[in-house]
Amino acid sequence: MRISCLLACFCMLALFCACAAPEAALPEPPAAQVQSPEEPPAPVEPPVEPIIEEEPEPALLLSEPVWLLGRLTELYQADETQWAALADVLEAAKTLNADAQLEGLETVQFQGREYIPLAEAAQRLGLEWGEAPDGLRYLARRQTVGQIPEGWNVPVLMYHAVGDEIWGYSDLFVSEAGMEEQLRYLQENGYEPIWFSDLAHIEDYEKPVILTFDDGYDDNYTVLYPLLEKYQTKATIFVIGNAMGSQHKMTQEQVYELAASGLVSIQSHTYTHGNLSAMDEPALRQEMELSNAALAAATGQIPYVLCYPEGKYSHLTMDVAKDYYTFALRMDGWTYQTGMDP
């Protein structure tokens, strides 16, 4: 029995020990690995282009325009230099077949266009400065006429207005059909219409003839000019300087177009069509200088022939005219006489 009690006590003690013993610690799970987010790649910087500083545009100020070989051309000024658009100067130079003369000149950029110093360009092109009656300056070419051989007698055919609408003195008019008939006759019979400048090499022509038209009537542009083109005939038109754009007279633009055609030579019929034989020397010089200035501005060419209005002149007229012209013309009745001393 004692053994039973001991056994019971032992069992209870074992049970107590079992209850009192702490439970064995379970192993902790491994800590979760926290991954940091990947950083985006650094942006690739584009290559930095070197900064090229553009030259600032020159400070050009708009100046008064100038008549450049018959065309009104804008000018800009900086300090003492006047600049014209290179395209305008090149166009003028091409009419002289001298555009190569402008090579190497300094140019500047302004408002999207290229400009060239006008004074230096004019010098290279052999142009002369002057002041037109409208107060603007002009640049024009002086035509050099060679030595005229002596002993030649060249017929000069004188006309005025051409057309079928007669509004003035009828003897001044030739009809359109009549004008064409005469041009056709000259062509079919071997006559060669020339300009006064062609007299320097008159021996090159077998049957030379000069066609002149006085006063610069507007029908010289509307009626005569198409006929000259049709028959490829040269003519000389004597224009009154202050009459351009007036009633029945050609405009300055029409005069320019004729002068640029290669068929028409524009020459002087004085500035006011006054009576030269009654003028003193200052008045004569004013007539001739203003006439030349007006026509030089309109055409880009300085006249070298003078037609005395109504054929009136004096010895003083001839003396003064020699300072401005190579040829002068007067009428004997209805016949023209040429030469500085008719």
Predicted regions and their residues:
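Acidic (Asp/Glu)-rich catalytic clusters
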Residues: 187, 224-233, 249-268, 322, ...
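C-terminal active-site subregion of NodB/CE4 polysaccharide deacetylases
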Residues: 143-212, 217-219, 278-342
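Short beta-strand and adjacent tight-turn residues that come in two discontinuous sequence segments
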Residues: 131, 238, 269, 330-331
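Primary recognition of N-terminal secretory signal peptides and signal-anchoring hydrophobic helices
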Residues: 23-152, 157
